[in-house]
């Protein structure tokens, strides 16, 4: 959520920043609604003060009867009625909060202006792409190996699900352990194993609600399946004041993730690129405003290191204003090369959300010996999605006979297995 105080004091700049997100000017409407709310709040405070004064007079009166006593009693009753009316007006005046809840984060100055992904900026590349490489797609390879099942799975669970079998299931497990080891041992992230069900308020705090309600799976009793472990990990600091010396706080977690893929009809309908359920290792960092820019590079490097160790070609893109996520002020997308598609595809997003999530969840820190608190900055990164990493391995490590060579760093995690071959029935 954006700061109403900042909007109030920077209306022209606010509209300018919104325009970079391709949103019409909102400052006038927000200022009007804010003025109404502040007027009601001011009246409530005045009446509360008047009630306090008159109640004190009543308490100090020697005689608890008589015209003067009864007149003041009537005044207090009238004040209470008026307060009830004003507080009801304030509770009903939800338009301002509803409007603020739908506004995305303000882009950082370094973010390029642009409408869509075609305007994203190339930051760096890693590895060489070979236009003459074997180019079967992952679902062809996995199906031929008899280790990836879509058909029978669809009969049981529907479209956009997959069952991995045998050595591909083992590869999935190996990748999880490998990624967690790198992030914890080399980058000092603290491992967590969180629930996959959260309450709606946790989804609100992280920015998924209310704007993206249709993109998640909801239960009938106020819970939602997480679309990413970020939801739980950032909420660890909700409604807390953190000692400055404990920052940064870095968390890593592997979880299944669940997305309805609303609005993705017709996109990536084959294979493992876009599923309703997928596993992902997620990174979250909680830090200070002064350190968040450095932390953004740090958390991005942690994600990149996984691909480097797997020797997978990739590039890093700085997303433009029109392609960034709702809660982000600056985002790097890491795109891995897929020979089967002959293109780079997104495998990770690494975002600095500034104080946007922190304001929603009231997460603050303070210096030792100080009573003043400041909103933390939150950052997140995919570190990485297991399915898309498997896709990249299958396509980049495929052999003429359809077998898959195991990347060197995974051989020990695979119990010494060096190649995945066809599994017989």
From Swiss-Prot:
Keywords, alphabetical: Aminoacyl-tRNA synthetase, ATP-binding, Cytoplasm, Ligase, Nucleotide-binding, Protein biosynthesis
PROSITE patterns from the UniProt entry: AA_TRNA_LIGASE_II (PS50862)
Localization in the cell: Cytoplasm
Domain of life: Bacteria
Record-linked Pfam families: Seryl_tRNA_N, tRNA-synt_2b
Residue runs in coiled coils: none
GO MF entries: ATP binding; serine-tRNA ligase activity
Comment on protein domains: Consists of two distinct domains, a catalytic core and a N-terminal extension that is involved in tRNA binding.
Biological role stated in the UniProt entry: Catalyzes the attachment of serine to tRNA(Ser). Is also able to aminoacylate tRNA(Sec) with serine, to form the misacylated tRNA L-seryl-tRNA(Sec), which will be further converted into selenocysteinyl-tRNA(Sec).
Family: Belongs to the class-II aminoacyl-tRNA synthetase family. Type-1 seryl-tRNA synthetase subfamily.
Name of the protein this chain belongs to: Serine--tRNA ligase
């Amino acid at each position: 959520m954006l700061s109403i105080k900042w909007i109030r004091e920077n209306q022209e700049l606010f509209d300018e920043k919104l325009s970079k997100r391709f949103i019409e000017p909102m400052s006038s409407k927000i200022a009007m609604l804010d003025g109404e709310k502040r007027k009601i709040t001011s009246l409530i405070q005045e009446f509360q003060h008047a009630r306090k004064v008159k109640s004190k007079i009543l308490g100090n009166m020697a005689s608890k009867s008589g015209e003067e006593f009864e007149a003041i009693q009537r005044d207090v009753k009238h004040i209470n009625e008026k307060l009830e009316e004003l507080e009801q007006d304030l509770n009903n005046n939800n338009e301002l909060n509803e409007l603020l809840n739908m506004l995305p984060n303000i882009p950082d100055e370094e973010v390029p202006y642009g409408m869509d992904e075609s305007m994203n900026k190339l930051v760096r590349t890693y590895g060489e792409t070979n236009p003459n490489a074997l180019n079967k797609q992952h679902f062809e390879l996995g199906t031929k190996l008899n280790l990836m099942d879509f058909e029978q799975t669809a009969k049981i669970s529907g479209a956009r699900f997959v069952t991995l079998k045998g050595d591909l299931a083992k590869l999935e497990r190996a990748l999880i352990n490998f990624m967690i080891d790198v992030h914890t041992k080399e980058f000092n992230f603290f491992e967590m194993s969180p629930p996959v069900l959260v309450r709606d308020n946790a989804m609100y705090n992280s920015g998924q609600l209310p704007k993206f309600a249709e993109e998640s799976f909801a239960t009938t009793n106020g819970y939602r399946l997480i679309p990413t472990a970020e939801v739980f990990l950032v909420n660890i600091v909700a409604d807390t004041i953190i000692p400055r010396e404990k920052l940064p706080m870095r968390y890593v977690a592997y979880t299944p993730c669940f997305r309805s893929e609303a609005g993705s009809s017709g996109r990536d309908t084959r294979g493992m690129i876009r599923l309703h359920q997928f596993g992902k290792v997620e990174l979250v960092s909680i830090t200070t405003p002064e350190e968040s820019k450095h932390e953004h590079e740090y958390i991005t490097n942690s994600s990149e290191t996984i691909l480097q160790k797997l020797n997978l070609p990739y590039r890093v893109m700085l997303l433009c204003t029109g392609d960034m996520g709702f809660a982000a002020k600056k985002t790097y997308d890491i795109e891995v090369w897929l020979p089967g598609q002959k293109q780079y595809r997104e495998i990770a997003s690494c975002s600095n959300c500034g104080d946007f999530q922190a304001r929603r969840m009231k997460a603050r820190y303070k210096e030792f010996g100080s009573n003043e608190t400041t909103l933390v900055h939150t950052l997140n990164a995919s570190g990485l999605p297991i399915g898309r990493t498997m896709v990249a391995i299958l396509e980049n490590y495929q052999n003429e006979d359809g077998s898959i060579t195991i990347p060197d760093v995974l051989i020990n995690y695979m119990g010494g297995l060096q190649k995945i071959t066809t599994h017989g029935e």
